């Protein structure tokens, strides 16, 4: 109960801290960042694969 009261005070601006809205945005941004990192890793792997294919001598 005390935590809810403190969070309500933060949301109202009566107490310093991270508001509920800011916390939700940070959570969303971290999730997006993780997704982009996974996509980046996949693209790096794919580019390395295709670069290796290009380096092979033609038959």
Swiss-Prot record:
* Region of interest: Disordered: 1-26
Superkingdom in the source lineage: Bacteria
Keywords (A to Z) from UniProt = Transposable element
Q: Which SUPFAM superfamilies match?
A: Homeodomain-like
Family listed: Belongs to the transposase 8 family.
The molecule here is called: Insertion element IS986 uncharacterized 6.6 kDa protein
Can you name the source organism? Answer: Mycobacterium tuberculosis
Source lineage: Bacteria, Bacillati, Actinomycetota, Actinomycetes, Mycobacteriales
């Amino acid at each position: 109960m005390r935590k809810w009261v403190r969070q309500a005070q933060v949301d109202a601006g009566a107490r310093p801290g991270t508001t509920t809205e800011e916390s939700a945005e940070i959570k969303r941004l971290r999730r997006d960042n993780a997704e982009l990192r996974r996509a980046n890793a996949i693209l790096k792997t794919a580019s390395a694969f295709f670069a290796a294919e290009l380096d092979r001598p033609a038959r």
